[in-house]
């Protein structure tokens, strides 16, 4: 899945109207000088609550057992987004990706492959190209207007797309209650 990055112009507009943060007090024994660049915390794009979530912690031992995943997840980064990958050798793989900047409406999804649905209290899209029958499926969960969680499943051998969608749906159902 590729995402659009339309939030940048809006972010720049919002930041242009923000005031300058005061500089933190100087540490004892150091001279305090005011630099021309502002010091302080980086600007916050939008608080979604996803920033506090470790994607690998979204599937605990009981969740992994329920999803048929007997391995620990490995943290990774996908296009700047935090993710976790679980690979069950010879069977399938699951990747959960947290996007703190792209809501469901921002994601580029071919309409012919997406089905609107709901997982728990979150709006969702199930994405699978049934004609390709490539053993892959994704469930995208909307978290507010500006964030999303993507659950991707790929079957070993790239076959049985319906099974991949069942697995993605199971993982989405386990992850969803832990989302803001």
What positions do the PLM features span?
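Sequence contexts marking disulfide-bonded cysteines in secreted/extracellular proteins
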Residues: 19, 55-57, 83-87, 136-138, ...
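Short, solvent-exposed recognition patches
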Residues: 66-126
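A short, solvent-exposed beta-edge/loop patch
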Residues: 115-180
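Amphipathic alpha-helical segments
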Residues: 53-72
């Amino acid at each position: 899945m590729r995402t659009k990055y339309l939030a940048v112009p809006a972010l720049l507009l919002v930041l242009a109207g923000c005031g300058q943060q005061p500089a933190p007090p100087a540490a004892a024994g150091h001279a305090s000088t005011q630099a021309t660049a502002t010091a302080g915390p980086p600007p916050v794009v939008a608080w979604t609550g996803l920033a506090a979530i470790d994607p690998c912690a979204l599937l605990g031992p009981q969740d992994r057992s329920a999803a048929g995943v007997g391995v620990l997840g490995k943290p990774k980064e996908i296009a700047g987004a935090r993710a976790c990958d679980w690979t069950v050798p010879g069977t399938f793989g699951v990747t959960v990706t947290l996007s703190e900047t792209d809501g469901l409406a921002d994601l580029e999804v071919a309409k012919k492959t997406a089905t609107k649905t709901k997982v728990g209290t979150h709006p969702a899209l199930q994405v699978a190209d049934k004609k390709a029958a490539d053993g892959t499926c994704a469930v995208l969960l909307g978290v507010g207007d500006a964030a999303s969680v993507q659950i991707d499943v790929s079957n070993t051998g790239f076959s049985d797309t319906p099974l991949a969608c069942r697995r993605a749906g199971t993982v989405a159902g386990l992850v969803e209650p832990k989302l803001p």
